[in-house]
């Protein structure tokens, strides 16, 4: 058996810090866009930087998925395909989405949860980002974990303490 190489990410800096990971924007080298606007992109390879940041990871964990919008999800897929030179979804890497869709939504983008809802409703005409995200999400297997509530944990702690 070989050790699994994992890149841990989150959609926000605070979430990334709490899990000792990085942000999706850092992984996708979003600095490239600002460098391009400044005209400093001549010797700059976004794909090369993404590959360096991925290392030999075969699994990317994304926490706080409720805050990921459809266009960023589509960009993640496109950039990983380029970086890995592979037309499979996400460049052939495994993606583990974590989080609660009932938490904070994506900022200025349609959330992944809304993409799933819109793709199943015939009276809504989703845009390209929404359709792309819904198509990618359809390839995922869904697992629901038991919900732990603070009051339950607190109660259990009180009952078990001496």
What are these regions (language model features)?
Residues 1-162:
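Conserved ATP-binding/catalytic motifs of P-loop helicase motor domains
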